[in-house]
Regions:
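Short cysteine/histidine-rich metal-coordination sites, predominantly Zn2+-binding motifs
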Residues: 31-36, 310-326
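Conserved small/polar residues in nucleotide/adenosyl-binding loops
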Residues: 334-335
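Canonical Radical SAM [4Fe-4S] cluster-binding loop centered on the CxxxCxxC motif
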Residues: 1-46
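Cysteine-centered iron-sulfur cluster-binding motifs in ferredoxin-type domains/subunits
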Residues: 7-14, 69, 249, 294, ...
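Cys/His-rich metal-chelating microdomains
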Residues: 10, 14, 18-21, 267, ...
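C-terminal accessory region of radical SAM enzymes
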Residues: 201-236, 261-309, 313
Length: 335
């Protein structure tokens, strides 16, 4: 099982898709859609010995440091790593990557770094100077012999549908592992049918070009880890039925700052998705199936249901959700 440990809800960035949108969405009556639990503290108060006992009950645990920005809690990271010997991963904005000593970094076998493509796109989404700072820090940890996998974690905004150009830029500067997600359906106020319809058309065309590029790379015996493609291809080749690909609520959970476990870190405040606590048995944590809205979909087990948070809260109208689904159906048909 994978466990995202939310070390803090604080962040040292104010990204447009996260901070800015959350401020605009504050009065969107979200409490009418879900029962909220906002009781957990800002920074992690979990007892490391209790965490160690819980993790020991799992045969194949992986800990993922998460936030907010996890590197704002470097001492907590060190405390956990000094006491628990398991595989580690981390999702970070990369601004403080140079602050964690290399002996700890090298025990983190995958680091997902938030970067959206070229300098203009990244700085527009995440603030001026972000791109240069993040790339400098990545260079520093490589120079210090970081031996793990660095994954570019992109957020694709409606203003930037050309995933092809942005992914090729990241490849050109040294990334061979890339993941992305469309910023769509996560806030109640930002749906614009005309703009998003145009985005989907341009995005799907760009994805088709990117798949052609990826397949040509494979033919030339170079397999780029474009994770959204890898998952679909693996399912098609192995006739595999996939649940939510992120693992939320079946093979992955988040540990809140108060020690409660939830199905997914981005819904840590939704009471319905509290699944247990550090006294629970991992095998007995509450599980969440693919959403009912997906039951009659022909690619249900290829897509896996896209996102538990999105399908549960239904913040966009159904027309908007259908457009989101079309981006996945189009990707599957091209592959």
């Amino acid at each position: 099982m994978h466990y995202h440990i939310i070390l803090t809800t604080k962040c040292n960035s104010q990204c447009k898709y996260c901070y800015e949108k959350s401020m605009n969405d504050f009065d969107a009556d979200i409490e009418k859609k879900a029962k909220l639990d906002l009781s957990s503290p800002e920074s992690s108060k979990i007892d490391v010995n209790a965490l160690k006992k819980f993790i020991a009950k799992d045969k194949n645990p992986v800990i993922i440091f998460y936030g907010g920005e996890p590197l704002l809690q470097i001492n907590k990271i060190k405390e956990i790593m000094n006491n628990i010997d398991v595989p580690y991963r981390m999702q970070t904005n990369g601004k403080l990557l140079d602050k964690l000593p290399i002996k700890y970094l090298n025990r983190i076998d995958k680091i997902l770094v938030s970067i959206d493509g070229d300098k203009e796109t990244t700085d527009r989404n995440r603030g001026k100077g972000t791109y240069d700072l993040v790339m400098n820090n990545i260079s520093l940890i490589k120079e210090n012999s970081y031996s793990g996998e660095i994954i570019a974690r992109m957020t694709l905004s409606i203003e930037s549908p050309d995933i092809y150009d942005q992914v090729l830029h990241l490849i050109s500067i040294g990334f061979s592992s890339i993941h992305w997600q469309i910023d769509a359906g996560f806030y109640g106020y930002d749906y614009d049918k005309e703009k998003f319809s145009l985005f989907v058309k341009e995005y799907n065309n760009s994805i088709a070009k990117l798949i052609d590029f990826w397949m040509n790379s494979i033919r030339n015996k170079k397999v780029l880890k474009l994770y959204p493609f890898l998952g679909i291809v693996n399912s098609l080749l192995n006739n595999e039925k996939s649940s939510l690909r992120c693992g939320a609520g079946h093979s992955g959970y988040a540990i809140r700052t108060d020690g409660k476990l939830v199905a997914c870190p981005i819904m840590s405040w939704v009471e319905d998705f509290i699944s247990g606590d550090l006294n629970s048995e991992p095998k007995n944590l509450k599980r969440f199936p693919i959403a009912e809205r997906c039951n009659n979909c022909q690619i249900k087990y290829i897509c896996g249901g896209r996102c538990l948070y999105w399908s549960y809260l239904k913040l966009w109208p159904e027309k908007g959700n259908e457009l989101i689904c079309n981006t996945i159906k189009d990707r599957k048909s091209v592959v």
